[in-house]
Amino acid sequence: MAGDQERRGRGAHLEGGAQETTLKTQPAQAEGEEGGRPHDPKLTLNVSDGAVREMEAGATGAAAGTVTPDGRVVEFTTPRAKLIEEANRAIRADLRTYPRALAAYEALRADPEALAHWDMANYVTMRKLGYNDHGRVHAFITGAASLAITELLLDAGVRTDLMESGVGDADDVFLAIILGTMLHDIGNQIHRTGHEAHGVALALPILDRIMGPLYPDAFKRVKVRSFILGAINSHDLSPAPLTIEGGIVAVADGTDITKGRGRKAFALGSVDIHSISALAVDQVVIERGRGKPVLISVTMNNSGGIFQVEEVLAPKVIRTPMRNFVELRAAIRPQGEEQILSRVRLEGDHFVMDLGGGETVRVEVEDTQKKVSDAIAQNLGVSAESR
């Protein structure tokens, strides 16, 4: 996810700080109300620190932590199992009128090979590289986001490439989107480098196993599968996606930039502009736009969050077919900026960072000059000491 913008820190230690995450999905409002723009977002990912936060009831009147009878308003808090449970509920609600896509999703979330792929991709990216979450939680969150985007596009009359090519209908589109989104990062278990191509190879047997019973016609099955594989291969813009389906997967991937994701990497030692800027993003909202079908709004608690918008999310809008369909906005929350970093001091070979929330982080200082010298010496075939 998010290309090489997710770098790692070294030797960091984090103390203190609980957090909570909220995902809310709601049905689009009927046309004619405020020019067809809904009062409530299609999907909101909201994160706040401290104790569980009371959420305001939406237009449906649902209280925090409840689900309306149609299953379209959900809110979740960490721990991880609860987050996945509620994301699953949101995805199933979005797919309830698309039987083939829903069947594919149910098969995927219970597939032992897929579960293992998510866990190992997360192990490599978080434990070995110090990156943000790329496992099961990321798959479910981005899956919910991708369906919200897809529904808004189809509601606006947009015909995706899968439909325009005559390969399939809306049910096939939702199937391709949910499978492509949830499998897009599994290649990280082999290595971050080339993870897109690795993901294609690893996804193939899973897709064939899931799609076989749903598409008895191999000719159509292979065609639908091509859109999924293309989305996996291009989700990190290397290469950039050529289809709307690929663009949806890439943009949905880019929306998972809230501090809930950044703090995980932070706690495991990745302390840099990437993880710190992620702590500055409180909320990502996906809703119907005014000038375009989709509006993605980012609410920041600190202006440092603009790095996440500029380096992670915006390129996935600009460099994909989604640039024609998505508005992107970012703003500081109404109550003003939050202090993320209050002081940095050097103690021995570590920077000690005092965070605004009272947490303390120790980061090993990298000897950049020595690393450069060693690299040059190695290239010349001599040791740094002999020169």
Regions found by a protein language model. Name each.
Residues 10-45:
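N-terminal intrinsically disordered, low-complexity tails
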